[in-house]
């Protein structure tokens, strides 16, 4: 196997401008950098290119099984320098590293991106195969990817469990508040009905007393009128 074309990039003062999760398999990230350096080798010759004040757009897609996908990297500076790197095939993703290997007949491309501590590193190589079809895999790197992938999955599962627990807790607290509100409302209605009943009874007593007083008054008037008639007769 012969490493034909190799490109290495290092970018300083890198900040992530935004991350857009279009779906659980498709993501778009945009980084901004102050300075950068691209070193390019072809066969036995190489050159260095300096970059400044630009942005990097990274579009990554992964399959449902997280084993295949595509990665596209666009780099542009305010001076008009633009570069594009892309590959599709076997993909490995971790917290800070994304690497993809694209195999064609007699050739293999490897694109690796690492973003950590304000720096972004890029490696893009093309390997020519000779003789038997060899599988170039860095066992240590793959184990690191698998370990970080397992840790990320565990963190996601823990977060989902915690979120579900908090949701159940909020639902329980909301039900308690609703039950308290219902009890308070029932108590207010009972108090209102009780006051209305007391008011009705008080009014009935007053009406009864008034009728009794009126009856006694008429009877007294009748007695006086009869006495007067008896005296005159």
UniProtKB/Swiss-Prot annotation:
Start and end residues of each stretch annotated as Disordered: 155-233
Entry's Gene Ontology cellular component terms: host cell nucleus
Sequence similarity: Belongs to the herpesviridae U79/UL112 family.
Source organism per UniProt: Human herpesvirus 7 (strain JI)
Keyword Nucleotide-binding: no
Pfam family, one: U79_P34
Protein's cellular compartments: Host nucleus
InterPro entries: U79_P34
Bias kind Basic and acidic residues: ranges: 170-233
Functional note: May be involved in DNA replication.
The UniProt record lists the keyword Transmembrane helix: no
Designated name of the protein: Protein U79
Keyword set, alphabetical order: Host nucleus
Main location: host cell
């Amino acid at each position: 196997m012969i490493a034909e074309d190799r490109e290495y990039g290092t970018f300083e003062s890198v900040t992530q401008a935004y991350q857009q999760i279009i779906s659980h398999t498709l993501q778009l990230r945009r980084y901004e950098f102050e300075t950068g350096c691209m070193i390019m080798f072809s066969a036995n010759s190489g050159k260095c290119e300096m970059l400044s004040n630009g942005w990097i757009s990274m579009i990554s897609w992964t399959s449902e099984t997280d084993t295949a996908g595509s990665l596209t990297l666009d780099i542009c500076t305010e001076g008009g320098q633009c570069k594009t790197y892309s590959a599709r095939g076997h993909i490995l993703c971790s917290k800070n590293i994304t690497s993809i290997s694209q195999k064609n007949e007699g050739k293999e491309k490897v694109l690796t991106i690492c973003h950590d501590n304000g720096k972004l590193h890029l490696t893009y190589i093309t390997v020519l195969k000779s003789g038997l079809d060899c599988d170039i895999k860095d066992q240590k790197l793959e184990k690191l990817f698998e370990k970080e992938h397992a840790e990320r999955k565990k963190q996601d599962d823990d977060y989902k469990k915690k979120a579900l627990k908090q949701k159940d807790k909020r639902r329980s607290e909301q039900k308690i508040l609703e039950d308290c509100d219902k009890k308070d409302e029932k108590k207010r209605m009972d108090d209102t009905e009780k006051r209305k009943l007391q008011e009705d009874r008080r009014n009935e007593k007053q009406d009864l007393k008034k009728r009794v007083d009126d009856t006694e008054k008429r009877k007294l008037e009748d007695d006086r009128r009869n006495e007067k008639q008896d005296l005159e007769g």
